[in-house]
Regions:
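Structural core segment of the AMP-binding/adenylate-forming
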Residues: 4-12, 39-101, 108-111
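Conserved short alpha-helical elements in the N-terminal third of ANL/AMP-binding
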Residues: 36-40, 158
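Conserved AMP-binding/adenylate-forming core of the ANL superfamily
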Residues: 1-27, 31-35, 52-57, 137-138
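Conserved structural elements of the adenylate-forming
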Residues: 1-4, 133-154, 159-166
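Conserved pre-ATP/AMP-binding loop-to-beta segment of ANL
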Residues: 105-122, 129, 152-158
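Conserved G/P- and acidic residue-centered "switch" motifs that form tight phosphate/ATP-binding loops
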Residues: 20, 41, 126
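Conserved AMP-binding A3 loop
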Residues: 118-142
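Short, well-ordered beta-strand segments
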Residues: 19-23, 118, 158-161
Length: 166
């Protein structure tokens, strides 16, 4: 799925250094986008679905995404946000699945790499406007490796994440 998403994003003009925002509750698409972005050198920008339209519009203006993916339950506001941000918006679901169905990318293709920036996560903004904290692939990999060792995880383990993915 990540390979098809990476190829589909590239076919829509998303490339190295571009940002793709995702506005959805916890959804497998968030992980698919994260791994797809890592392949093409793009950055994922997860949005806090608890924020007001005004706060989201500010974050999108700050992040300057090339594209907005959104969950069906946010379709009403997402169209306005995408228009305000000047980027296309695509609803997560069967239409997006069908659009990328014909795409594929070999694992070794794409400009993504360990030194590439991978995600922009916004702080809570307790002292002012939220700030976009940029996370590199290497930092996220190091975090995953530390978790793997700290919890003695094996390929047979499953992880339940109850936290929001923004």
């Amino acid at each position: 799925e990540a390979a098809r998403m990476a190829s589909w994003l590239a076919s829509r003009g998303v490339g190295s250094g571009d940002r793709v925002a995702i506005y959805a509750r916890n959804h497998p698409e968030s992980f698919i986008l994260l791994f797809a972005a890592s392949r093409i050198g793009a950055m994922m920008v997860p949005l806090n679905w608890r924020l007001s339209e005004e706060e989201l519009a500010w974050q999108l203006a700050d992040a300057a995404p090339s594209m907005l993916l959104y969950g069906a339950d946010f379709a009403g506001i997402a169209g306005k946000l995408a228009s305000h941000a000047g980027c296309p918006g695509f609803e997560i679901g069967t239409k997006l699945d069908a659009a990328r169905e014909s795409h594929g990318m070999e694992a070794e293709e794409g400009p993504g790499g360990p030194d590439a920036e991978l995600m922009v996560v916004y702080t809570s903004g307790t002292t002012g406007r939220p700030k976009g904290a940029v996370l590199a692939q290497a930092a996220m990999r190091a975090n995953a490796e530390m978790s793997h060792h700290a919890y003695a995880m094996t390929p047979d383990d499953h992880v339940l994440n109850i936290l929001p993915l923004f």
